[in-house]
A protein has these predicted regions:
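Short coil turns that delineate tetratricopeptide repeat
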Residues: 54, 91, 135, 172-174, ...
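Alpha-helical adaptor scaffolds
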Residues: 146, 210-228, 235-274
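Structural motif corresponding to the intra-repeat A-B loop/turn of tetratricopeptide repeats
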Residues: 36, 70-73, 107, 151, ...
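Start-of-helix register in tetratricopeptide repeats
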Residues: 58, 95, 102, 139, ...
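N-terminal leader/linker segments that initiate helical-solenoid repeat arrays
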Residues: 22-69, 77, 81, 95
Length: 332
């Protein structure tokens, strides 16, 4: 069975709330801004709403989402304060209860096992309230399902309850149910079943859930690649690229498949496509390795230099590796 980890899923779960009739998705504009990493605009919009109404539940909840999304541990205490303020001012608000549950999960990730044990029951109860207040709040539903899957039984975990949450969602939206069932199957190590469910899910209209879709497709494709099942891996990376053309992970994965099969020219082409979407250091590092294997010294040097100059920076160990490769190439 593949390892399961709360930290693996939570950062990519929906950054928005749904409301309205079944099969209809309505996303708050601030949630969309946070999802799109337009943090400055999101912050300005939150401030404007709170200036009009200091207890606006959507704005207070979005301020929690924004602090979590920035990924700075120092912001989590203030996010917790914002979440508690949201709940205190709006005790029957689903988005406020959800926001507080989300920051509890973020603190559990940052604080490790001790923090998770300390927050577990309060997190579960808070997310359950969010669903009780609004059964159409799919982010809270998916987040609670992940909690049930990851937490041990004595801390409130329950695989049975996780599947029940997915089944309950079927009355509201079958495609989100397929995503949730895929996540459950993956958690149980049933990769074929997970693949079947995720490929059957049409999440085109669900912009804010596509992070979960991406991570699951990416992990399934990578599992095939690690096992040497290149055709299956390539098929899933192609699907990832088709469904999420704005993500670099599709072409990057296809490059890894081509590289594993010795098709270095194709690997380089796919890496160039990935870098055009997201010029991240890890892509340039891999591109440098491919060009070096192709004995293309100038392109390898350029790629390695881009890897060292990019942000977010490579891990220290990877920086040392790239620096060593670069020095060797320059000596030739």
């Amino acid at each position: 069975m593949l390892p399961k980890s709360l930290a693996w899923w939570v950062p990519v779960l929906l950054l928005g709330a749904w409301s309205g009739a079944a099969f209809a998705v309505q996303t708050d504009p601030i949630a969309r801004l946070v999802h799109q990493k337009r943090y400055g605009e999101a912050s300005s919009t939150i401030e404007a709403r709170l200036a009009r109404n200091a207890t606006d539940p959507t704005a207070l909840a979005a301020s929690v989402d924004l602090r979590i999304a920035r990924g700075e541990p120092d912001e989590l205490p203030q996010a917790r304060i914002d979440g508690e303020r949201c709940v205190e001012a709006n005790p029957d608000s689903s988005v406020c209860a959800e926001a507080l549950g989300n920051v509890m999960l973020a603190q559990s990730r940052a604080g490790g096992l001790v923090a998770f044990v300390r927050n577990a029951h309060a997190t579960r109860d808070t997310l359950e309230r969010a669903i009780r207040f609004d059964p159409m709040n799919y982010r809270a539903r998916v987040t609670l399902m992940v909690f049930y899957l990851d937490a041990p039984f004595f801390l409130g975990g329950s695989e049975v309850r996780a599947r029940e949450l997915a089944t309950e969602a079927r009355r509201l939206d079958p495609d989100l149910t397929r995503l949730m069932r895929a996540m459950c199957a993956f958690d149980e190590g049933k990769l074929d079943e997970a693949e079947q469910h995720i490929l059957a899910a049409d999440l085109t209209e669900y912009e804010l859930v596509q992070g979960s879709q991406r991570e699951l497709l990416l992990t399934l494709a990578s599992a095939h690649l690690d096992a040497g099942r290149h055709a299956q891996s390539g098929r899933l990376f192609q699907e990832l690229s088709r469904r999420l053309p704005s993500s670099e992970h599709g072409p990057y994965g296809l490059a890894q498949v081509a590289r594993a099969q010795g098709r270095l020219a194709e690997a380089a082409l796919q890496l160039e496509r990935a870098a055009a979407i997201a010029p991240r250091p890890y892509i340039y590092k891999t591109l440098g390795e491919v060009h070096e294997a192709r004995h293309d010294r100038p392109r390898a040097i350029a790629a390695y230099q881009a890897a060292l100059a990019g942000v977010p920076p490579l891990a220290r160990r990877e920086q040392k590796q790239v620096t060593a490769h670069l020095a060797e190439l320059k000596r030739r």
